[in-house]
A protein has these predicted regions:
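Transmembrane-helix bundle of Major Facilitator Superfamily
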Residues: 2-169
Length: 169
């Protein structure tokens, strides 16, 4: 039963919120999943630790430099279209990360993945404001914040599991 002054979320809004939560989770996992793989990558590519650190740095620098302008770009081109582009870019870049034959291609793929993640993070938050009833925006933002924290915390464990079970690819 809904409390006075609140609105229940319709099933379609719940599905939208689930999709937005997944978008936030995936982009947040990307921030920390590669950290534990750096020693393995240094060995696989016969590279120094300073060189393989760029796998993490490329992702984070791209997110931090692009995320602010994504909101305005979404206003100009359409948020839904741009979010789908971000998800597509993130997915393709993730595949490229898995098959990269050189360290430099892996770094470039991580930068592209960071671009997709920046789009996903920024527009996920924007969609909450236009999709969820005003009385539920705080709860929805809390859910997205929780998904971001879970993704960031889950990244190293997931990365370690993937490295130990399947190698870095």
């Amino acid at each position: 039963m809904a409390q006075a002054g609140t609105t229940d979320l319709t099933p379609s809004i719940r599905w939208i919120l689930a999709g937005l939560s997944l978008s936030m989770l995936l982009s947040s996992i990307g921030t920390s999943i590669a950290n534990v793989s750096l020693p393995t990558l240094a060995q696989a590519f016969d590279a120094s630790f300073q060189q393989v650190q760029w796998v993490v740095i490329a992702y984070l620098v791209t997110i931090t430099t692009v995320i602010v302008s994504v909101g305005r770009l979404g206003d100009m081109t359409g948020r839904r279209r741009l979010l789908l582009v971000g998800v597509f870019l993130f997915t393709v870049a993730s595949v490229l990360c898995g098959v990269a034959p050189t360290l430099w291609l892996l770094i470039a793929a991580r930068a592209a993945q960071g671009l997709g993640a920046a789009i996903m993070m920024a527009l996920t938050m924007a969609f909450v404001g236009e999709t969820v009833p005003k009385s539920q925006v705080g709860s929805a933002m809390g859910l997205l914040g929780t998904m971001s924290a879970i993704g960031t915390a889950l990244g190293p464990s997931l990365g370690g599991m993937l490295i130990s079970e399947f190698s870095w690819r």
